[in-house]
Amino acid sequence: MTDKLIIFDTTLRDGEQSPGASMTRDEKLRIARQLERLKVDVIEAGFAASSNGDFECVKAIAEVVKDSTICSLARANDRDISRAAEALKPANSGRLHLFLATSALHMEKKLRMTPDQVFEQARLSVRFARNLMADIEFSPEDGYRSDPDFLCRVIEAVINEGATTINVPDTVGYAIPELYGNFIRNLRERIPNSDKAVWSVHCHNDLGMAVANSLAGVKIGGARQVECTINGLGERAGNCSLEEVVMAVKTRKDYFGLDIGIDTQQILAASRLVSQTTGFVVQPNKAVVGANAFAHASGIHQDGVLKARDTYEIMRAEDVGWSANKIVLGKLSGRNAFKQRLQELGVAMESETDINNAFIKFKDLADRKSEIFDEDILALVSDESVTHSNEQYGFVSLSQHSETGERPQACVIFTVAGKEVKGESDGNGPVDASLKAIETHVKSGAEMVLYSVNAISGSTESQGEVTVRLQNSGRVVNGVGSDPDIVVASAKAYLSALNKLQSKADRVAAQG
């Protein structure tokens, strides 16, 4: 009889800590719904006590997602725990995730606490949390670099107080697979009550081994939960990649002997959604979800695949959501065909009004572009989903003029708090002129630290997807915009980033 491996997704919490990856409430809700369609077991929706905005995000996700356990991170203190429990009240199934550093370095330099003080705080915080909720996870932060004797003492105590999941993080990505797997196994063997909790792994990718370490924690250490993110999103070099660990366990069931509840056909839709929302482009050679993941350039390989797919393919592209039919719709396609394709791509719009608005944009795109690809549709609905009436800035139209030897001129019409304004400027190029035209009214003072363009599909007709990263007063945000006209896509991306900066500033102001 096989065991089940629990998939704990932390894209919305740990993944969002990647510089520029901050998401709005509506963007988080859309990703949470996709994670639910993916059949993720546990969704870490945020850190409820960190801000009013995060509290509202966790609460909103708990209200709408009913088929996954919703989790909030909390420091090991009564205030954080109470705040997280309050945000999780609407959840069908909720989990409190408590963390407290246990390595000598963190206790001395960060917490400025003695080991005995940390031990008591860990024990009492779990006791307090257990009075509020039955499902309690405890993470000894920097656990892999902690003294094993002290770690055993802490973990035994928190299990006695009611912790149901023990997560051992490799917080700085220092571990090596065999050593990490043995570390988990030794803890489980030494702690008398280790069988009273599910053991979990949480690995960072600083040395490029987050997935390998996680799998070693499962196979060697006996862990039955993996904490991971879509596309491996996360601070520094990222986290364990959900799609990679899931497909490794599923493809090599002969080795791992574990069941997994993930609907793998939703993996690609989740990857694209996270990429388009955050502006972090997936590298072409990324395992499972990269554009080249199932491409065969070698003539020998192509011949083998045509004769028998399993000569060079260990998993089927369609099993993770890739479609063999790339060209899907055109200008004569109707609303029902458009709606059906959205469903096939795993996209759920909020209402019929949203579908109608997206369809109008689709028809406009089809008038300008003869062949509409899946990537075009996903970019289009992503643009539609991040445009809301309550946003400070909204794109309306753009015109620009340039001749060889002259500075380009641009005129951008956009909304500020619902009112249309017109900005005009020249610049070093049409993009520069357009963004300067926006700044004639906004005067954000933000510094652009990244500007990148990605072709959504592979032709000169392709839509361009532009990512703009802005930095202001210590806040870093990404904005994403798409359009067949790169200048228009740039203006949309810039306004998107400005909206996120405004949203962050509003949250800070609300907290006083």
Swiss-Prot record:
The gene is leuA. It comes from the Bacteria. It catalyses: 3-methyl-2-oxobutanoate + acetyl-CoA + H2O = (2S)-2-isopropylmalate + CoA + H(+). This is 2-isopropylmalate synthase. Residues 394-512 are annotated as: Regulatory domain. Gene3D superfamilies: 1.10.238.260, 3.30.160.270, Aldolase class I. It is found in: Cytoplasm. The keyword Metal-binding applies. Homodimer. One of its GO terms (biological process) is L-leucine biosynthetic process. NCBIfam families: leuA_bact, PRK00915.1-3, PRK00915.1-4. Residues 5-268 form the Pyruvate carboxyltransferase domain. Mn(2+) binds at D14, H202, H204, N239. Pfam families: HCS_D2 (PF22617), HMGL-like (PF00682), LeuA_dimer (PF08502). Catalyzes the condensation of the acetyl group of acetyl-CoA with 3-methyl-2-oxobutanoate (2-ketoisovalerate) to form 3-carboxy-3-hydroxy-4-methylpentanoate (2-isopropylmalate). It comes from Polaromonas naphthalenivorans (strain CJ2). Belongs to the alpha-IPM synthase/homocitrate synthase family. LeuA type 1 subfamily. It is an enzyme of class 2 (transferase). GO terms for cellular component: cytosol. Its cofactor is Mn(2+). GO terms for molecular function: 2-isopropylmalate synthase activity; acetyl-CoA C-acetyltransferase activity; manganese ion binding. InterPro entries: 2-IPM_HCS-like, 2-isopropylmalate_synth_dimer, AIPM/Hcit_synth_CS, Aldolase_TIM, LeuA/HCS_post-cat, LeuA_allosteric_dom_sf, LeuA_bact_synth, PYR_CT. Its EC number is 2.3.3.13. Keywords: Amino-acid biosynthesis, Branched-chain amino acid biosynthesis, Cytoplasm, Leucine biosynthesis, Manganese, Metal-binding, Transferase. Pathway: Amino-acid biosynthesis; L-leucine biosynthesis; L-leucine from 3-methyl-2-oxobutanoate: step 1/4.
